[in-house]
Amino acid sequence: MGVQSVESEASAMNLIPNAPGLSPNYWCTWSTQNFGREDEHPDYHNYLGGVGSQFARAEMNEKNLRRWLQQFPKIRGDLYLMLDDGWDVPYGVHPDKSRDRFGTLELDEERFPSFTGTPAQRLKKLNDFVKESGWRGLGLWVPAQAAGPIEKGPAMEAYWTERLLWCKEAGVEYWKVDWGTYAHDVEYRLFLTQLASKLYPQLIVEHAYCMIAYNGSQ
């Protein structure tokens, strides 16, 4: 076999598998919420910290989701589409003044008007829509807290039991647990993981640890 023949055969190889993989992987919307907007802010400070987060949350809606779903046509069957921060709160709600509004796990009706019904039904309709668009399924950003003045104990367990059962009914298979009142509370994160394992073992619970940049000298 000549060199030209080998090169031709190699260039024709397709290394992307035909069937979706079993290992969990996702594409997260957060960077696109920040940098995929149609408007442009020349001042980079508009992309940082709380200000940047406010702009990013404003981009979380059904119109943009329908556009995001068209990405990665060759590989999205392997990927969950991870809805990041902003999907379960109304427009204009931010943690600097309304932290206790986050964590409802109820798809905001103004942001996603086409997906109606009970909280579980809304999530299922959205998850089905994501799958019909060629993705592996829907993933959800979840804060390390409950919405409202709910303390640890039976009330907290009842709160998350209800939401885990919503996701089970909806077929949502991935949570990314991020910032929140209990972001740095290992016991709280363990509680969520163990409760999910008990009630909905098919759910993958990822824990994102929130911290400032680390440069190796501190």
Question: What is the meaning of each model-derived region?
Answer:
Residues M1-Y80, D85:
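Carbohydrate-recognition beta-sandwich/jelly-roll modules
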